[in-house]
Amino acid sequence: MMGRPEGLKLIDENGKRIDGRKKYELRPIKMEVGVLKNADGSAYVEWGKNKVLAAVYGPREIHPKHLQRPDRAILRVRYNMAPFSVEERKKPGPDRRSVEISKVIRGALEPALLLHMFPRTAIDVFIEILQADAGTRVAGITAASLALADAGIPMKDLVAACAAGKIDGEIVLDLNKEEDNYGEADVPVAIMPLKNDITLLQMDGYLTKDEFLEAVRLAIKGAKAVYQKQREALKEKYLKIAQEVEGNE
């Protein structure tokens, strides 16, 4: 959260936000599954101005062998922001933030995966942020979960994610860049809706206990809406495949 420019209002007296949305409204979201031919699974997500590509490879053999787990697969996640993804060009390669978010995303996805079915292997997830506009970790989790499902990795449920936050004293859904920079708090949440489980819950900023609970409830509601979009994107891909198969008969 940064010091804000003088006179900047993030939300007006009618509850209208800086980008025209209402308090509890998500940014526009578009999802597509199976976008990379050479990956075992892949997905592309546009979320507001965020553009995120996720690719999954595996389960595959691990080298060196001492990294293998005899009882389960290991999940390796690499979250990377492309140098051109933000206005100020960033240095290529992982920085401390990317390493931290990679770990956070791995922790959010792991509870959904039946890793014991693939001992001594690795499942590699690559998340590339092509354009960043606040909420890249929840968009990354959402894209990675779709790519894992597309790769046919057995899962208890899809993982859907969304954030809520506080701007000008109001709890709102799905912060954009200005709200994230100049707001008071951000609460990203990831869930497995069918299991009623939370796999990620973080908070950046300051909230009272009541505000925190309201933000979590709102983020869960947003994640459930994201989950429906994930299911539609997967359905769309497999309807396409079915039509192609029928056409070839």
Swiss-Prot record:
GO CC terms of this entry: cytoplasmic exosome (RNase complex)
Main localization category: cytoplasm
Intracellular or extracellular location(s): Cytoplasm
Molecular functions (GO terms): 3'-5'-RNA exonuclease activity; RNA binding
Disulfide bridge positions per record: none
Keywords on record: Cytoplasm, Exonuclease, Exosome, Hydrolase, Nuclease
Transmembrane segments: none
Single GO BP term: gene expression
EC number: 3.1.13.-
Signal sequence bounds: none
Pfam families the UniProt entry points to: RNase_PH, RNase_PH_C
Quaternary state and interactors: Component of the archaeal exosome complex. Forms a hexameric ring-like arrangement composed of 3 Rrp41-Rrp42 heterodimers. The hexameric ring associates with a trimer of Rrp4 and/or Csl4 subunits.
Annotated function: Catalytic component of the exosome, which is a complex involved in RNA degradation. Has 3'->5' exoribonuclease activity. Can also synthesize heteromeric RNA-tails.
Similarity section: Belongs to the RNase PH family. Rrp41 subfamily.
Name of the molecule in the record: Exosome complex component Rrp41
Source organism (scientific name): Thermococcus kodakarensis (strain ATCC BAA-918 / JCM 12380 / KOD1)
Lineage of the organism: Archaea, Methanobacteriati, Methanobacteriota, Thermococci, Thermococcales
Gene name of this polypeptide: rrp41
